[in-house]
Amino acid sequence: MELSGRKRKAAFDPERRVKVRRRDVEKADAWEPPSEDEQDARSSSPAEESDQGQEEDDVDEEDEEESGASEPEDDREAQLSFGARLRLSQKRQKPKPKGSTEQDPSDAQEPSWRGREARQGNAKTVSKAAASASAPGRKTKSAPEEMSSKRPVSRYREVVKPPPNARPKPRDVRFEQELTGEDYQRFRRNYAFLDEYRNDEMAKLREIIARKKGVTPADREDAKLKLRKMEDEKRSQDRKDREHELMREHKKKEKELVKQGKKPFFLKKSEQKKLLLMDKYAGMSKGQVDKAIEKKRKKVAGKEKKQLPFARRAME
């Protein structure tokens, strides 16, 4: 007869008699019917127990799935070589990107003020990254500037961008070069008092030059230089005023002709110079015109002479 280590199971006999224990009998005698409150509590408890039991079953199933999924992974990792396992662990321990907003478990253990500072820093970096992505610019200092194609291109190119909160600097229109048409006429009307100041100053300088006593030679020479400079400025200003006056008269005549049904005629730069030259010589005598022409000829000849190359020495 062979003996096995396993115990034999008893055969199931439905007519088998079981002896009743004494303590079971005592419990049955001591049983009392439950009260109404207990019955209400029991009637509500099965639903709660079923919910709790269902939740526990779900948790157990999730744990079993995780453990079942992790066991094959552990078996696969155990079969890998040491180098492969090292690379896999390094890949898992890679740092998070700067723009990621996921919270590490170590951050939860830090004090509240540290976590607040870290969140503020992350928000600042994210806002800076968003601003740099939205605002066009240049990748490097030598690269061309990138502009958004969704914004309309301005007619005027901004060479120097002013700071965002900069106030406009005051300008002196007397030194503005681009004054034409009505702007120039308005400027001359608004600053007509400057001509009076200049005339008064020129009269005082002439008095200083004509005075024989109480003026040193150095002061007299200084007054002569100032007077010559102011006279040149006045002549150039008068010439400029005359040019604007001639162009205004020409435009006025053309407007009258256009009203009569004729086509407008616009002067070219060369024709404007001829018109100004004719007006300049119209108020001169014959001798003054000859002197002006000779002076102009010498000036042009001097410029041409400067442009000529130096004469080469001949070989002996």
From Swiss-Prot:
Indicate yes or no for the key word Coiled coil.
yes
Please tell me where this protein is predominantly located: nucleus
Q: Where in the cell is it found?
A: Nucleus, Nucleolus
Q: Which residues form a coiled coil?
A: 218-260
Q: Does the keyword Nucleotidyltransferase apply?
A: no
GO CC, sorted alphabetically, is: 90S preribosome; nucleolus
Which Gene Ontology BP annotations are present?
Answer: maturation of SSU-rRNA from tricistronic rRNA transcript (SSU-rRNA, 5.8S rRNA, LSU-rRNA)
Task: Specify where the region named Disordered lies, as residue ranges.
Answer: 1-177, 227-260, 293-316
InterPro entries for the chain: RRP36 (IPR009292)
Q: Which UniProt keywords are listed?
A: Coiled coil, Nucleus, Ribonucleoprotein, Ribosome biogenesis, rRNA processing
Origin, by domain of life? Eukaryota
Which residues fall in a compositionally biased region of kind Acidic residues?
Answer: 48-76
Q: Which Pfam families match?
A: RRP36
Composition-biased stretches, type Basic residues, lie in: 88-97
Q: List all Basic and acidic residues biased stretches.
A: 10-30, 142-160, 227-259, 301-316
What this chain does, per the entry, is described as: Component of the 90S pre-ribosome involved in the maturation of rRNAs. Required for early cleavages of the pre-RNAs in the 40S ribosomal subunit maturation pathway.
What does the similarity note say?
A: Belongs to the RRP36 family.
Task: Describe the subunit structure.
Answer: Associates with 90S and pre-40S pre-ribosomal particles.
Protein name in the entry: rRNA biogenesis protein RRP36
Q: Which organism is it from?
A: Pyricularia oryzae (strain 70-15 / ATCC MYA-4617 / FGSC 8958) (Rice blast fungus)
